[in-house]
Amino acid sequence: MEPYKQLYYNILIYRTPLYNSPWYDFQRGFIKVGEILSGNVYEGNSPYLNFTVNVTDENLVNMSYSLWAVIGHANTVYTRLKTANASEAVKNQCMGECLAWKAMAYFYLVRSFGAVPIIHDNTDELNSGNYNSKFKVEAADVYEYIIMTLEKAMELLPARGETGRIDRYCAEGLLAKVYLTKSGLSGTRNADDLAKAAEYSKDVINNSGRNLLANYSDVFRLANNKNEECLFSWHWSAGRDPWTQQNTLQSDLAMVGFDEFGDCWGGYAGPSVDLQDAFGISALESPETRSDTDTRRKATMMMAGDVYDYFWQDKGGFDYLRFIYDAEYGKGGPNGDYQSPTGANHVKHLYGNNNDHVLGLGVSAGNMYSGLATHILRLSDIYLVYAEAKMGLATSTTDQSALDAFNAVRGRAIPGVTPKTSITWEDVWKERRLELACEGDRWYDYVRLAYYDSQRAINELKAQRRDVYYSLGTTYKAYYENGSWTVNPDETRYNPDAKAPNVTVSSFTLPFPTEDVVFNPNLMKDPVHVDVRSEFSY
């Protein structure tokens, strides 16, 4: 290979880990914070379910470590690229990607922990000797730093790059979401922030050249790892060397025996009863009479009667109840033990068996590794950002452009549904939940709501059905064996003693892990104000 081309590929490879390895230890926190805290997912005895997360929680520790690792890696690569011997176009593209990922990491940090330190340049921090005494920076300043970082990323990035890589419109989509989130930070919604969220999201919708995929479930298939709808994604590699390059979510989320590697243990957790309520269905309803008009339900949670043509393709598809109750078909599986206490198991973040993985990517999966991409910012999210932001300070709108964005998302999910001619804030709020369920995002909607209406966020979380059903297996086994659907309400019922979670205003800010505080005791002190645009520059 010619030296110049070799250098080009070396630079591209150099920034590639930002799409996977530093994020690895956030995978569990991504689900536990984003989905269990928010009431979308049930996991028995989880501190994220009952709001008792403490400073030694392993998943919280790993989450924080991962997010700071992303920032450190992005800073290092960005600094080195500035003096690399390569074309300005290549350097700018890669530097822009570094800044976009850095902004994403800070976006997770500020929404999770509130005020956090700003690490602008690793070398400067090390040379100063103050890296373990940094003060937290006020959340408003952190948001301004994120905005500043994304503005520079947009300046550097091409309008359209290699498929699956971040381009200018991807960064702009994130910028729109940042402005929407920031809009309520002061305690009341800021009209200017909402206007900017609408402006940036509309530009992405109109000018990025990207479209929603026609079929919702296709977004999450292996063959579509790099698709036009996904603006930011973790692109994993199917292997264990080095460890951290791979997707391990199937192990945590799938039922035992779902693949042939003996690495699945997620059957006793799953999408919550409350999320089923949001979709307008119930685990107590017969599959033959269940009102299943929203295609996102089946693409998000598997329930009695569901069969998936994209899982277990070498066996004619994956039959949910057959897998549980037919020991020959479901070898290594639950063997007649219905595990889910909610009547649903996960679909998103699963690739299937090894044959499915080979068909999708051309390479094998293995024990605790796959190459299935994890999408963390999608175009449909930006459509809904626009619909909400376009309302401004109002609680409803008949604006046609907002309706078009909302109806595009809803219309894909529910074929043939009548388009809405007016939408409320509540419509968009619910649509976001259904569209992005189990994608690590819902908790952060509650965080931004709590910025300006904490009581509403608290009331909604307390009213959720976050508990379990009893004896679902009795009904499901009979239905599988003889087609009879009978529910004895004295036996098969939702837990009548379920208690509301202890949600308070402080619940919307996670505690810093002990390790972080030991390393930097100033994390326990009040944050400081920093004029980030004067203090930092790119």
Enumerate the language-model features and the residues they cover.
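Short coil/turn linking the two alpha-helices of tandem helical-hairpin repeats
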Residues: 110-117, 161, 181-188, 392-396
